[in-house]
Amino acid sequence: ETSDLILRTLDAGAHQHRAYAGEPLPTFETVARACQALGLHANVEIKPAQGFEQITGETVARQILALWGSAQLPLVSSFSEESLVAARRVAPQLPLGYLCVRPPEDWMRRMDALAAYSLHCAARKLDDSVIATAQAAGIPVLCFTVNDRQDAEALLARGVTAVFSDRIDSLRGL
C-alpha cells in the first residue's frame, strides 16, 4: 500500500521518453476532466481489494457523480458483482458493464440482476452464441484486450460492439 502523498511524487513519464519526464501520475479527477474536455467516453473499472468490494463500489460511484455531474456518465465495469451492486445502490443511473473472462452459462441472469447495460469479456473466450443472444436482447458486447487491427476487425464483423485496447493507435479508423 502506497499513500497518496507518495504517489503524487512519482514520475509517470520518464520511463516512456525523456520528453515526458516529470509527468505526474494522473488522478481520477484529472482523467475525468480530460475525458470531458476531449469528448471521450470512459470505462471506469472497479478493482476492489478483497474484502472491500462494497465500500469500493460505493466510493467509486460517489466519485463519478461528483466528477461527471450531469455530463454523460462513464460506463462502470467490474469483475466484482458485489462492487457493481454497491455502485448501483448509490447511483442507479450509472450504466454498468458485467465483466467476466468467459461468460458463464447464466450470464444473462447475472446481467439482469445487476441491471447491467453491457457484457465485457475476453476476446479469445467469446463464442458466437453469446454474441447472437446478446444482439437479440439489445445488449452491447465489448471485448478486451484487442491490440491487433485484424483481430478487432474480425470481432466487429462477428457482431461485437466495441473493443478495449492498449494500442488504440493501431485501431485508428475502425
What do the PLM-derived regions correspond to, one by one?
Residues 1-98, 114-117, 121, 135-137:
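Metal-dependent phosphodiesterase/phospholipase catalytic core, i.e.
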Residues 18-21, 97-174:
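C-terminal active-site rim and adjoining tail of enzyme catalytic domains
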